[in-house]
C-alpha cells in the first residue's frame, strides 16, 4: 500500500496566550499559502475562546507569521477540510 505524499505548502503563525494563573500557552495556527495575519488571528482567538470555556480565562498575547513548510498529512487533511489547523506546542490542550 502506498502512503500519500504531502504536497501542500502552509504558512505557520507562531501564537502565544496566557492563562489567568500566568501559564504561557504556545500553539501554531497553520493556513494555506495566501492566508493572512488577520485570518490567523481570528482562528487563534476562536481557539482561545474554545479552550477558555473549560478552564480559567485565557488571553491571546501575540501572533506572528513565522515560516512556510510542507504540511504533515494530518495538518494537510485538516487545512483542506477546515481551511486552517491548530497545532498545540506548549501547555496547550488538544484543539480537537
PLM region spans:
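Short, charged/polar N-terminal "headpieces" of proteins
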Residues: 1-25
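Phosphate-binding glycine-rich loops and adjacent basic patches that engage nucleotide phosphates
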Residues: 2-11, 33-43, 96
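Generic structural hydrophobic/aromatic packing signal, biased to beta-strands
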Residues: 13-15, 29, 44, 86
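Generic structural motif
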Residues: 18-20, 32-36, 89-91
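Short, flexible N-terminal segments of the mature chain
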Residues: 25-51
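Acidic, low-complexity intrinsically disordered segments
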Residues: 43-96
Amino acid at each position: 500500500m502506498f502512503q500519500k505524499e504531502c504536497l501542500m505548502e502552509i504558512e505557520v503563525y507562531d501564537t502565544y496566550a496566557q492563562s489567568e494563573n500566568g501559564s504561557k500557552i504556545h500553539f501554531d495556527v497553520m493556513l494555506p499559502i495566501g492566508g493572512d495575519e488577520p485570518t490567523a488571528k481570528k482562528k487563534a482567538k476562536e481557539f482561545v475562546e474554545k479552550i477558555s470555556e473549560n478552564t480559567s480565562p485565557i488571553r491571546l498575547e501575540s501572533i506572528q507569521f513565522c515560516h512556510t513548510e510542507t504540511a504533515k498529512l494530518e495538518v494537510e487533511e485538516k487545512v483542506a477540510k477546515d481551511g486552517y489547523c491548530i497545532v498545540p506546542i506548549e501547555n496547550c490542550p488538544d484543539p480537537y
